[in-house]
């Protein structure tokens, strides 16, 4: 792994730490000013701009108390891909649920310039791959 790839992975890890804490300074230190975060069409429109995205994650933390864990992460050049687990609390049930997904990051000058998020919510149950042995493979579990 090259030094720039290792740096890019550390930036993504710091971004996830910022999502976990809701700390605007940490989040902004990882984002390009013109970052775009894309979601699946059934979820949200793209979020554009570092300030907007950082404030989004701060609010998300305050409302749903998510805790992300990066399960796998790889880098190639200026792109990083992570597979993650997130336990969170939907407003309707107040019960902790597990959400799993992947994100593709495009980096620019050791900052996140683009995020493509692949996951779906299930407010009434866990959003996981059916039958996948998460615990046996060392993934975060509830």
Region spans (language model):
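A beta-strand edge to alpha-helix "cap/lid" segment located at domain peripheries
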Residues: 2-7, 20, 55-142
